[in-house]
Structure formats: C-alpha cells, structure tokens
Amino acid sequence: MSQEAGHSFFDAMKDKGIIAGTVVLSKHGHDAGRIYVVVAEHESFLSLSDGDKRTLDTPKRKRRKHVCPLGQMEKATEWLTSLKELPVPQQSSELRKAIRNFMDGHRGPVTS
C-alpha cells in the first residue's frame, strides 16, 4: 500500500474518499462480496470493473455507500491510463491479474 509523506490509506480516504484505482468490495446487491477496481468516480456513483463480468467498456455503476474500500493500488492513475490503451481482451486479463495480485498482498499491478 502506498504511503506518501506519512499519509496512510485511511488518511487519504478521509481527504479524498474513494477515488479511481481504489479496490472495493461490493456490500449490497446481487454482486455482494465481489471485488472491483474503481475506474471512474462521479458525485454519488462509482464506475467499477473486475475484468470478468464487468470490463472497462461496460463498468458497473454503483453507489458509493454500497461498497467498502479495501485499499489503493500503487500508481493507479498511470496504470489505468495504460490499461485503457490495450486491446479489450488484454485489458480484462490485466485487470483480473491486478485484482488477484492486490488480494494476495502485493498492492499493485503485475508487471511483465
């Protein structure tokens, strides 16, 4: 988990809230328990992708209050930008790898 200038993930959450690159757990709905990456943020909604049922092309739109933040991916902004430049099948594959890697405790996208 990245910590800039003595700030923890929780300090960043207090300052900015859930932002793009945050890994979240769905708390409510038919997808409860599913892990997503926030790919875009709106006032009260988030756009979520998991690389499986929800790709970058068709993100899930979910209310902020219906997700629980798990952590922030390192260099998330740069990673999401480079991810969007890949072909769709590769985007999904890289997104799934990054979520799996994050959940295994590495906190960032897998580099080849």
Model-inferred region functions:
Residues 2-20, 27, 37-112:
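Ferredoxin-like alpha/beta domains used as RNA- or RNAP-binding modules
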Residues 29-32:
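Short, charged beta-turn/beta-strand-edge "cap" motif at the junction between a beta-strand
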